Amino acid sequence: MDDEEETYRLWKIRKTIMQLCHDRGYLVTQDGLDQTLEEFKAQFGGKPSEGRPRRTDLTVLVAHNDDPTDQMFVFFPEEPKVGIKTIKVYCQRMQEENITRALIVVQQGMTPSAKQSLVDMAPKYILEQFLQQELLINITEHELVPEHVVMTKEEVTELLARYKLRENQLPRIQAGDPVARYFGIKRGQVVKIIRPSETAGRYITYRLVQ
């Protein structure tokens, strides 16, 4: 892949990551959300083959709007298939900086031992893996994907009381669903899905993540 194409891909991927962080409630500047390809090149370079940028240059650290101590890293490992050594380096950095959540944007995937280490570190450290291919477009901007809103515990309690339901009576959505993964929705959370409706203006459904 030539430099121009690779730079374009890296820009698109990082832009989706910025939108994802923003949509999860983390503080991202408007400049970060709106960064053009030219601005990306000015900041990071346009010659990936010469290490400008190296993937590690694209690392992101964001703090949550509601709680500045709730921070999240986004790592871009250099190696196409990520091994356990890299995961240990990331985990050490997270420990040093007292950060418990990170996203890892991988080119081709992870080795079985690296994948297992993510499972072993949860729930103390939450590391989520995304394939860069998944991030070339923002799935939530697709016209067929309805708006998803993660509900607070209070909103869920109110919803169940209003309809006299138990939580396990709600329809389900898988935690591995692409939109659920984008928002970082965990098992046991409830998501409100808002679809446009020709008759009612909008049609709302609720799903329990499993």
UniProtKB/Swiss-Prot annotation:
* One GO MF term: DNA-directed RNA polymerase activity
Q: Which residues carry this modification: N-acetylmethionine?
A: M1
Transmembrane segments in this chain: where? none
Q: Which GO terms describe its cellular component?
A: nucleus; RNA polymerase I complex; RNA polymerase II, core complex; RNA polymerase III complex
What GO biological process term is on the record, naming one? transcription by RNA polymerase II
Q: Location of the Glycyl lysine isopeptide (Lys-Gly) (interchain with G-Cter in SUMO2) covalent cross-link?
A: K81
Instruction: State the compartments where it is located.
Output: Nucleus; Nucleus, Nucleolus
Q: Which Pfam families match?
A: RNA_pol_Rpb5_C (PF01191), RNA_pol_Rpb5_N (PF03871)
* Taxonomic superkingdom: Eukaryota
What family, per the record?
A: Belongs to the archaeal Rpo5/eukaryotic RPB5 RNA polymerase subunit family.
Give the quaternary structure: Component of the RNA polymerase I (Pol I), RNA polymerase II (Pol II) and RNA polymerase III (Pol III) complexes consisting of at least 13, 12 and 17 subunits, respectively. Pol I complex consists of a ten-subunit catalytic core composed of POLR1A/RPA1, POLR1B/RPA2, POLR1C/RPAC1, POLR1D/RPAC2, POLR1H/RPA12, POLR2E/RPABC1, POLR2F/RPABC2, POLR2H/RPABC3, POLR2K/RPABC4 and POLR2L/RPABC5; a mobile stalk subunit POLR1F/RPA43 protruding from the core and additional subunits homologous to general transcription factors POLR1E/RPA49 and POLR1G/RPA34.
Describe the function of this protein.
Answer: DNA-dependent RNA polymerase catalyzes the transcription of DNA into RNA using the four ribonucleoside triphosphates as substrates. Common component of RNA polymerases I, II and III which synthesize ribosomal RNA precursors, mRNA precursors and many functional non-coding RNAs, and small RNAs, such as 5S rRNA and tRNAs, respectively. Pol II is the central component of the basal RNA polymerase II transcription machinery. Pols are composed of mobile elements that move relative to each other.
Q: What name does this protein carry? A: DNA-directed RNA polymerases I, II, and III subunit RPABC1
